[in-house]
């Protein structure tokens, strides 16, 4: 019986902290944490260094997982919409495990030029999101019971589908609509493509979801989305299509973040 009051107390603290502006400033500052490389490198080569990590992170070392990482979240998202709280724990557990894996394995790579590289800021940011999802597995504040929702709320669905399919060649950054590639590409093992799917589900059930999880997950999505907008539409405009692929992340994250701070009485 003591566990429930303790859980409620921790959740209340998280709800309070995630309303504070300084938390988001601290999360933003994580981007300024230096990237680790086992071989010394010229700071002017930072973009190339990060690009090498993101093009071949450790998590891509198991290509057999790529189609699985698309089909499982799709099944879980549909399952939550159809069966409600009977699918809550599988959904929460999958997202928590996925984010834990992404925190350590999508932010790291072994490169010929720089050796072992870890994008420390990204690791810390995604790890914070992952820890909150681990907490949600314990607290179960996401309530996925069947509810009537306005039709306009479904605008997130097609954008989430685009992110899940991600018709892009991650090597050339060019469009790739080959049917087999849509099923087997890397999207299911990336934070930027999977977060729109996760947030889309949460926004469809808002306000009966964990507010702390929604706030931090969406803010991290906003940050990473903004960085990708700058990179692919500015610094590396040759890869503009990859920028297009990040538009769902930006739009859904901004929407989810605004929703998470909106008064529930107005819903």
Predicted features and spans:
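N-terminal topogenic module of multi-pass integral membrane proteins
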Residues: 2-115
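Membrane-interface capping segments at transmembrane-helix boundaries
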Residues: 2-20, 138-142, 257-267
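Juxtamembrane "helix-exit" motif on the non-cytosolic side of transmembrane helices
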Residues: 38-39, 104-114, 166-179, 227-238
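Short aromatic-rich membrane-water interface segments that cap or initiate transmembrane helices
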Residues: 51-66, 177-194
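Non-cytosolic membrane-interface motifs at loop->transmembrane helix junctions
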Residues: 113-124, 146-149, 178-187, 238-248
């Amino acid at each position: 019986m003591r566990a429930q009051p303790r859980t409620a107390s921790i959740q209340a603290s998280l709800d309070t902290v995630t309303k504070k502006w300084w938390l988001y400033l601290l999360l933003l500052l994580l981007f300024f944490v230096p990237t680790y490389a086992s071989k010394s490198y010229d700071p002017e080569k930072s973009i190339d260094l990060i690009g090498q990590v993101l093009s071949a992170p450790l998590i891509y070392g198991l290509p057999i997982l790529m189609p699985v990482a698309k089909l499982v979240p799709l099944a879980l998202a549909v399952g939550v919409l159809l069966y409600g709280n009977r699918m809550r724990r599988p959904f929460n557990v999958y997202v928590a495990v996925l984010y834990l894996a992404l925190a350590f394995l999508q932010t790291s790579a072994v490169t010929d030029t720089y050796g072992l590289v870890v994008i420390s800021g990204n690791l810390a940011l995604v790890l914070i999101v992952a820890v909150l999802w681990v907490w949600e597995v314990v607290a179960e504040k996401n309530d996925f019971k069947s509810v009537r929702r306005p039709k306009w709320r479904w605008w997130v669905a097609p954008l989430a589908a685009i992110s899940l399919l991600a018709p892009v060649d991650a090597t050339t950054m060019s469009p790739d609509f080959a049917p087999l590639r849509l099923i087997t590409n890397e999207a299911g093992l990336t934070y930027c493509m999977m977060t729109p799917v996760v947030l889309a589900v949460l926004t469809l059930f808002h306000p009966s979801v964990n507010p702390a999880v929604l706030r931090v997950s969406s803010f991290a999505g906003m940050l990473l989305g903004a960085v990708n907008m700058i990179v692919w539409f500015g610094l590396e405009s040759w890869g503009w299509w990859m920028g297009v692929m990040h538009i769902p992340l930006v739009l859904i994250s901004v929407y989810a973040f605004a929703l998470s701070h909106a008064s529930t009485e107005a819903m």
